[in-house]
Amino acid sequence: MAFVKAIKNKAYFKRFQVKYRRRREGKTDYAARRRLILQDKNKYNAPKYRFVVRVTNSRVLCQVMYATLQGDRLVCSADSQELTRYGIKVGLTNYSAAYATGLLLARRLLKQKGLADEFKGLEKPSGEEYHIEEVSEERRPFKCVLDVGIVATTVGNRVFGAMKGACDGGLHIPHSNKRFPGFTKGEDGADDSYNPEVHRARIYGLHVAEYMRTLKEEDPERYQAQFSAYIRNKIDPDSIEKMYEEAFQKIRANPDPVKKEAREVKRVRQGAMIKTAKSQYVRNVKLDKETRKERVLKKIQMVADKMAEEE
């Protein structure tokens, strides 16, 4: 079939239909979202939970959500910035932090639902493939499906680290090991292989420790600049594994979020100026009809007096 170039005339623009705003902005893949939220028709009013992972420049966000006609509803969430409470004060966006955030969300959600004692998950991460539904026989675990957004699902991506943390924490998320670090695809008909030790090294931050040692030997100045936060917090390559190991135990001991105290909002009016704790802005007092009428009469009188003086 010959290539036919689209003629962008008046009829083309008249019939043109724009895509959804979030599709135009490159934020949502609606084809993938439709498949994610579509529930079986024989499950009446049963929400389909999604394990949502989003990675920014400064944090890893994990949320469990479900879709409604009015919009998505949040069930539980965890943020890698919370890991500072558990002893992880640096590297809040790496693979290990993503795993810890997923673990924190899983333990928090199960405690919220009253399932924490029944579904404890894998207490000592080993990198081995683990499915909670194969362990529990009496009761079905809390099930979610992974929502990665628009990221490239490459081997070793941090979203799969967060998913691994949630699975080890006791959530049931259907998956395989094909996107975990340590997976190697077989060539020329050979079988695929998976090395859990490589994955375990990523979970405990051993790849960071190895890079720290290498950089310290080869370029000490760059090491001082790149790992300044580690040096400031007195974290050396030999203490990284212990830091994460203790953090995982603390997360299991107390996954509850810290409740923030509601601050008093102080607003003071000084004439037409509103002053708050952070800023100030102008908001004129609304006048009633009688006051406005008096102001108009005064202005008329002022103009009349001025004209009389000039004469």
From Swiss-Prot:
One Gene Ontology term, aspect cellular component: cytosolic large ribosomal subunit
Subcellular localization(s) per the UniProt record: Cytoplasm; Nucleus
Domain of life from the UniProt record: Eukaryota
Coiled-coil region list: none
InterPro entries assigned to the protein according to its UniProt record, in alphabetical order: Rbsml_uL18_euk, Ribosomal_uL18_C_euk
Sorted UniProt keywords: Cytoplasm, Nucleus, Ribonucleoprotein, Ribosomal protein, RNA-binding, rRNA-binding
Name of the molecule in the record: Large ribosomal subunit protein uL18
